[in-house]
Amino acid sequence: MILRRRGIVLSFHSNMVTVEDEETGERLLCKLRGKFRLQNLKIYVGDRVEYTPDGTGSGVIENVLHRKNLLVKPHVANVDQAILVVTVKMPETSTYIIDKFLVLTEKNELETVLVINKMDIYDEEDLEKVKELERIYSKLYPIVKTSAKTGMGIEELKKYLKGKISTMAGLSGVGKSSLLNAINPGLKLRVSEVSQKLQRGRHTTTSAQLLRFDFGGYVVDTPGFANLEIGDIEPEELKYYFKEFNEKQCFFSDCNHIDEPECGVKEAVENGEIAESRYENYVKMFHELLGRGKS
């Protein structure tokens, strides 16, 4: 009798699933048991599964084990943390994009590391932009400054990645694949050139896949994003995902920090305790979500 084993889903190939055995590290191409189709059961990259090996390097997935979380875009299960890779040019990542991403990671209760990449190409003006990002975010999230070309920050970033399942995201062209190759050269990911006209890279990743680091841990390399959807968040819920807002006392317990009097958040913005860009981006998102409700 062949005993069931446990593994983790790395990627999909048509109707087949690549599974890595959690004990041996062996990779098998597995089919799904018929009940998945009959019961419309879903399976995602990052899922921990029970499977039955057939002894020839293949197997059949029997069950999906309990998920601690499931990200929607991209669909990834059991993620421990998010790594947001940003650049201040070629392309420039706006604080609005950063804050939208952070709203999503806060909503999904993920630890987040902000990586400022391409440090080797920045002039004095660019370095001032880097300092501004540090001023805005360093008290809220860990920041690692990196260069895949010079190796700057690579060892520091490895410490955050070791032993965890991380999702890495960022605008196309910020250098995610180059960073991953610098962190773990054995990955040999394809790297794109950045278009000077659009200042965006060509997408080198077309679907989510789980990549294993030699030093332990996994990363989900996902397609670059240009638009982040926060449409399933209620306007009144948004404030909870700007975590520095939660420390402030307002006169009204249900204050949305927009037009209400005696608002602790607005006072903190005026006093310089909360970054103006964070508050402006919050207000913009709040009105976007309100407008969605009226359409």
From Swiss-Prot:
It is found in: Cytoplasm. CDD domains: S1_YloQ_GTPase, YjeQ_EngC. Keywords: Cytoplasm, GTP-binding, Hydrolase, Metal-binding, Nucleotide-binding, Ribosome biogenesis, RNA-binding, rRNA-binding, Zinc. One of its GO terms (cellular component) is cytoplasm. Residues 68-228 form the CP-type G domain. Pfam families: RsgA_GTPase (PF03193), RsgA_N (PF16745). GTP binds at residues 117-120, 170-178. InterPro entries: G_CP_dom, NA-bd_OB-fold, P-loop_NTPase, Ribosome_biogen_GTPase_RsgA, RsgA_GTPase_dom, RsgA_N. PANTHER family: SMALL RIBOSOMAL SUBUNIT BIOGENESIS GTPASE RSGA (PTHR32120), SMALL RIBOSOMAL SUBUNIT BIOGENESIS GTPASE RSGA 1, MITOCHONDRIAL-RELATED (PTHR32120:SF11). One of several proteins that assist in the late maturation steps of the functional core of the 30S ribosomal subunit. Helps release RbfA from mature subunits. May play a role in the assembly of ribosomal proteins into the subunit. Circularly permuted GTPase that catalyzes slow GTP hydrolysis, GTPase activity is stimulated by the 30S ribosomal subunit. This is Small ribosomal subunit biogenesis GTPase RsgA.
